[in-house]
């Protein structure tokens, strides 16, 4: 089970032109995503008042930034029709780092949706009992656990640490498949509960703020980010996938990572004043610091939004 992506040569000139168009759009979109995530990362790290969800989004922006960097570089040989080829070690390192950031981003989205769901369903109890440094600990745990999984995959499926073990490699990819399914199911359940609470709760006529952002980001993953994970599972579990799905999944992965900053700034901007407000203020508003978060800011002084991590 090699981690290098092999694709069949396009059968016609039209197929080749289509593939090159998709790859070129992927590169351009990734470049725009680098800019957007870089701005979001800088604002979240420097200019935005810290709350637990800003810490989560800071980590998400960091994972997306690294993912897009690896994504852009990894598809250059195919875009140039193999006129430029990276050494095997460099290519494998790029795609494993890209997959690592993909799993980190997915895990962080699950953590965000779960916390927001709990804060919305049980505002008083959850906000009062929430440990002060929970967000920092959860983010650190996700990065470390995903790194260990990535190292195990690298050791079992490549020659980084000796001869690969194909049996162990197959077992690990089955574990990844179960993990991906569990994370997606958890995300769907928490987002559904959050949606029902937002639409049917007593706060449905009030500003939605951060819960809306969470729901939109989850929908973005399900439609744009999930195909990339399905492609990697199908490739490494020897499932047959058509060539067009390969290009489609890579393009949609770029959309997924590049569109998040646009969602942040779109939701945080005031209608009629878009592109006129400071980006810091727009991002602050998207995080819910100027409205309620989890339906109740007044439920707990020093609660989930106002608490500095």
Swiss-Prot record:
Orphan receptor. May regulate nociceptor function and/or development, including the sensation or modulation of pain. Residues 1-21, 81-91, 154-168, 234-247 are extracellular. It is found in: Cell membrane. PROSITE patterns: G_PROTEIN_RECEP_F1_2 (PS50262). Belongs to the G-protein coupled receptor 1 family. Mas subfamily. Residues 43-59, 113-132, 190-212, 269-309 are cytoplasmic. InterPro entries: GPCR_Rhodpsn, GPCR_Rhodpsn_7TM, MRGPCRE, MRGPCRFAMILY. GO terms for biological process: G protein-coupled receptor signaling pathway. Glycans are attached at residues 19, 236. Keywords: Cell membrane, G-protein coupled receptor, Glycoprotein, Membrane, Receptor, Transducer, Transmembrane, Transmembrane helix. One of its GO terms (molecular function) is G protein-coupled receptor activity. The chain crosses the membrane at residues 22-42, 60-80, 92-112, 133-153, 169-189, 213-233, 248-268. This is Mas-related G-protein coupled receptor member E. One of its GO terms (cellular component) is plasma membrane. Pfam families: 7tm_1. The gene is Mrgpre. It is a multi-pass membrane protein.
């Amino acid at each position: 089970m090699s981690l290098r992506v092999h694709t069949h040569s396009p059968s016609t000139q039209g197929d080749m032109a289509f593939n090159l168009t998709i790859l070129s759009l992927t590169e351009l979109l990734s470049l725009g995503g680098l800019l957007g995530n870089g701005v979001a990362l800088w604002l979240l790290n420097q200019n935005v008042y810290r709350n637990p969800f800003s810490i989560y989004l800071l980590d998400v922006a960091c994972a997306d930034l690294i993912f897009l960097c690896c994504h852009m570089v990894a598809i250059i040989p195919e875009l140039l029709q193999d006129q430029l080829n990276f050494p095997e070690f460099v290519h494998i390192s790029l795609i494993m780092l890209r997959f690592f950031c993909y799993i980190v981003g997915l895990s962080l989205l699950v953590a965000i949706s779960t916390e927001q769901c709990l804060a919305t369903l049980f505002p008083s109890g959850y906000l009062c009992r929430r440990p002060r440094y929970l967000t920092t600990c959860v983010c650190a745990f996700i990065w470390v656990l995903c790194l260990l999984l990535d190292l195990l995959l690298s050791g079992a499926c490549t020659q980084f640490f000796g001869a690969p073990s194909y049996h162990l490699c197959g077992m690990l990819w089955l574990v990844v498949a179960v993990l991906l399914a569990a994370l997606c199911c958890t995300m769907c359940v928490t987002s559904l509960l959050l949606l029902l609470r937002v639409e049917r709760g007593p706060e449905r006529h009030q500003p939605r703020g951060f819960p809306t952002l969470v729901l939109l980001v989850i929908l973005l993953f399900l439609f744009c980010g999930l195909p990339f994970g399905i492609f990697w599972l199908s490739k490494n579990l020897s499932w047959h996938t058509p060539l067009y799905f390969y290009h489609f999944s890579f393009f949609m992965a770029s959309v997924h990572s590049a569109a998040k900053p646009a969602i942040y700034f779109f939701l945080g901007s005031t209608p009629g004043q878009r592109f006129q407000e400071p980006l810091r203020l727009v991002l602050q508003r998207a995080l819910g610091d100027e409205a309620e978060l989890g339906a109740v800011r007044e439920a707990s002084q020093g609660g989930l939004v106002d608490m500095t991590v």
